[in-house]
Amino acid sequence: MANVVNMNSLLNGKDSRWLQLEVCREFQRNKCSRQDTECKFAHPPANVEVQNGKVTACYDSIKGRCNRDKPPCKYFHPPQHLKDQLLINGRNHLALKNALMQQMGIAPGQPVISGQVPAVATNPYLTGIPANSYSPYYTTGHLVPALLGPDPVTSQLGPVVPQTVQVAQQKIPRSDRLETSPLAAHHHQQQQQLQHQLNNINNNNNHSTAGAAATSTTATTTTNNAAAAAAAAAAAAAAAVMGHHTLEVGKKRAADTTDMFPLVFFCSFPSPCVFAFLNCSIFGFLRLWFSLFNLRH
C-alpha cells in the first residue's frame, strides 16, 4: 500500500524517510552468515532504535562528519554500499522536491504554509518499478503533469481554452458472461413462433381424429333438432296469428288474408282419402268401359 506523503513536510525538507533502511531479519535472529559490509540489509547495533523493521541512517555519518561517541549515536551508521544506496535516494528526493516547487511557483528556500499543498498518496523512492505491474487499477494523478512540465509547443501557441467533450464510455467485455446480439434474439423469437405453430397443427390433427367419430351422431342430432325447431316455429306462428285478433261477442270481423292460408294449404295438398276415392272411381270406370266393349264384340 502506498504511503501517504505530506507534501508540506516534503517541501520543507523535513521528510527523512529516504534515510530509512530495512533491517536484516536473519540478523535479528542471529542467523545471518553475511558480514554487515556484504549484506544488502542493515545490521544495526544494540543502541540503534528499530521501528517496524527499519532503521534511520545518520545523515552526518553519510557525510562523514558524525563524532558522537558518548553517548553513542542513536542513528544507524551504514556501511559504504548502503551509503551509496542512500545517496541515490537523496538525489531522487531532491529532484522531486525541486520539480514540485517549480510547478507551484515557489522559490527554493521559501517556506511553505501548512495546508497549502494537499497530501498525496505516492512513494517517490520506488523508482524504476512500473506501477501497473503491482496495481493495475491505479491511475496517474495530478503529479505526472507537474513533473513533466508545460509543453513548449503549447506555450508558444498561447493559452488553450478547455472544452467539454463527451466521450462514449467503452463497454468492457466480460469473460464470465456471453453478450446476446439483437440478431440472435430475433432468430430465437422466430424459432419460438415456428414451434408454437407446429404444436397448434399437431393439436388440430389430434382433435380432428376424435371429432370424425362424433360427426355422424352430431349430424343426426342436428337433423332432429332442425325438424323440432321447424315444428315449434310453425306452432308459434299459428299461435301468433290466432292470438293477433281478439274475439268479440256479437260482432263479425272482416276476413283477413291470413285466414285463407289453412284453406289454400288444405286444397293444395289433398288428404289420402281423396286419393283413394279418385283411384276407385277411375278403376271402376275403366272396368265398366272394358266390359261394355267386350259385349259389343
From Swiss-Prot:
Any one GO biological process: apoptotic process
Primary site of residence: nucleus
GO cellular component, one term: cytoplasm
Keyword Transmembrane helix set for record: no
Tissue: Expressed in embryonic muscle cells.
One annotated GO molecular function: zinc ion binding
This protein's name: Protein muscleblind
Originating gene: mbl
InterPro entries the UniProt entry points to: Znf-CCCH_Muscleblind-like (IPR054429), Znf_CCCH (IPR000571)
Organism (species): Drosophila melanogaster (Fruit fly)
Mapped zinc finger ranges (C3H1-type): 18-46, 52-80
Domain of life: Eukaryota
Family: Belongs to the muscleblind family.
Matching Pfam families: zf-CCCH_10
Alphabetized PROSITE patterns for the sequence: ZF_C3H1
Lineage: Eukaryota, Metazoa, Ecdysozoa, Arthropoda, Hexapoda
Signal peptide residue numbers: none
Compartments reported by the entry: Nucleus
Keyword entries, A-Z: Developmental protein, Metal-binding, Nucleus, Repeat, Sensory transduction, Vision, Zinc, Zinc-finger
The protein's role, per its UniProt record: Required for terminal differentiation of photoreceptor cells. Vital for embryonic development.
Matches recorded under Gene3D superfamilies: 3.30.1370.210
